[in-house]
Design a protein with these regions (language model features):
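Conserved Ser/Thr-centered positions that define the repeating blades of beta-propeller domains
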Residues: 35-39, 97
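Short, solvent-exposed loop/turn segments at conserved positions within beta-propeller repeat blades
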Residues: 24-29, 84-91, 155-156
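Surface loop/turn signatures of beta-propeller and other carbohydrate-active proteins
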Residues: 1-11, 20, 41-62, 102-122, ...
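Hydrophobic core segments of beta-strands in well-ordered, beta-rich domains
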Residues: 1-26, 31-34, 44-52, 60-64, ...
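A short local loop/turn or secondary-structure capping micro-motif enriched for an aromatic residue
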Residues: 26-28, 52-54, 80-82, 116, ...
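Residues that flank catalytic or metal-binding motifs in active/ligand-binding sites
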Residues: 5, 29-32, 44, 59, ...
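Acidic, glycine-rich loop-and-beta core segments that form the ion-binding/anion-interacting portion
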Residues: 66, 76-78, 83-99
Length: 194
């Protein structure tokens, strides 16, 4: 391949898998899957890709099983802008996965995590109670934040508020992390804004 980056580790069926974001020599995005039984020696076992090319590079791969549905999380680069979709220079979302990481695997249609700007490099973690939580980077490496007063003062980009992922009737749902409710207090009425 031309470009490989962003390793992510996944444990499944007693084996350790390493996912790598990649760009093929034909300028097509994919995720490479390597398998290990001892955590030191890995062998390439799969290349995850869509039936039709989807971008020229997939960064930041991750893998999560949400309510029984496996998802490949990725940040495809080079997706043409549409009226209400793909407004970021690079995208962040997931592909529903059918099949094992190391075998015959089919990826479903890409689902964007966010239609706003500046959401990238999402990562999941599993809470003690089994919920799958999603964090993203509020920033784009190639964006010019020079006109932002925060950036001029040395504050630039941040992590997003965590989200809970749910798979309901064949669709991805995202909700704010329920623990955030503890941060709420009595409402404050603000006068007329000008």
């Amino acid at each position: 391949t031309q470009h490989v980056r962003d390793p992510q580790w996944v444990q499944q069926n007693g084996k350790l898998y390493m996912l790598l974001g990649a760009r093929t020599q034909e300028d097509e995005g994919c995720a490479l899957v390597y398998e290990s039984e001892d955590g030191t020696r890995f062998r390439h076992v799969n290349t995850l890709r869509t039936e039709q090319p989807f971008g020229f590079m997939w960064e930041c791969p991750d893998y999560a099983v949400v309510d029984g549905q496996p998802l490949l999380i990725a940040c495809p680069q080079g997706i043409p802008h549409e009226t209400y979709r793909f407004a970021n220079p690079h995208q962040c979302g997931c592909f529903p996965v059918d099949g094992p990481l190391s075998g015959q695997t089919t990826l479903g249609d890409f689902i964007s995590f966010d239609y706003g700007f500046d959401y990238y490099a999402a990562r999941t973690l599993k809470a003690d109670d089994g919920r799958v939580l999603l964090f993203g980077w509020m920033g784009m490496s190639e964006a010019d934040y020079g006109c932002n007063p925060c950036a001029r003062n040395g504050w630039d980009q941040a992590l997003s508020l965590p989200r809970e992922l749910h798979w309901v009737n064949g669709a991805l749902r995202q909700t704010p992390l329920r623990e955030l409710q503890a941060l709420r207090s009595a409402p404050h009425k603000i006068g007329r804004a000008h």
